[in-house]
């Protein structure tokens, strides 16, 4: 049992002390949140570059091994799905996931399979980015003996990323800072004449 005289000397936190603690927490959050958002954007951009690297490597394997088995060494402008021959998901049309050059996460991350897209809208973005065939490389799959081009653009400019990326047969990932307003869909602005992305 607590002695009533002891209770007099017990104290809790004063209102001033609680306000000081709340102010310190507010200051720490004001410092931490922008840094966390920047880290998320940087992470999304790294993942977009890796996705383009994967597409680039898949295109070269498709080209070198004539994986569509048509006798021509050519590229493809299709990510496709299992069961769709001549695509990076199913080059020979075997419907076997083991034959796929890329995994299924690319299927729903493409804005418009086989043709250039003007807006980064897709069913399931890869780390906030949609993918599209580049109009710098042409649109006729049968004439793609000399070039391919893929682009990545953010689904929400300056929220999911600040840069658009592209990859072509020159084996260099290129980028440009988006011109879109914050929150707007990306528009696949990077092209074959952009500078190489160093990070």
What positions do the PLM features span?
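Extracellular/periplasmic head regions of type IV pilus-like filament subunits
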Residues: 57-161, 169-170, 196-199
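Aliphatic-rich helix starts adjacent to a transmembrane/signal segment
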Residues: 35-52
């Amino acid at each position: 049992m607590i002695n009533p005289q002891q209770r007099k000397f017990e104290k809790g936190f004063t209102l001033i002390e609680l306000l000081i603690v709340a102010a310190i927490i507010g200051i720490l959050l004001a410092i931490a949140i922008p840094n966390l958002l920047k880290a998320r954007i940087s992470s999304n951009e790294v993942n977009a570059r890796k996705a383009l690297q994967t597409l680039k490597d898949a295109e070269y394997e498709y080209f070198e091994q004539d994986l569509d088995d048509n006798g021509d060494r050519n590229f493809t402008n299709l990510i496709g799905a299992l069961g769709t021959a001549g695509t990076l998901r199913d080059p020979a049309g075997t419907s076997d996931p083991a034959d796929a050059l890329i995994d299924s996460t690319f299927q729903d991350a493409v804005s418009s399979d086989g043709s250039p897209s003007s807006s980064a809208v897709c069913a399931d973005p890869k780390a906030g980015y949609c993918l599209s065939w580049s109009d710098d490389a042409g649109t006729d799959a049968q004439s793609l003996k000399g070039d391919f081009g893929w682009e990545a653009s953010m689904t929400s400019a300056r929220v999911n990323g600040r840069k658009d990326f592209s990859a072509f047969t020159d084996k260099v990932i290129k980028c440009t800072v988006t011109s879109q307003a914050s929150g707007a869909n990306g528009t696949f602005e990077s092209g074959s004449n952009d500078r190489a992305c160093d990070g």
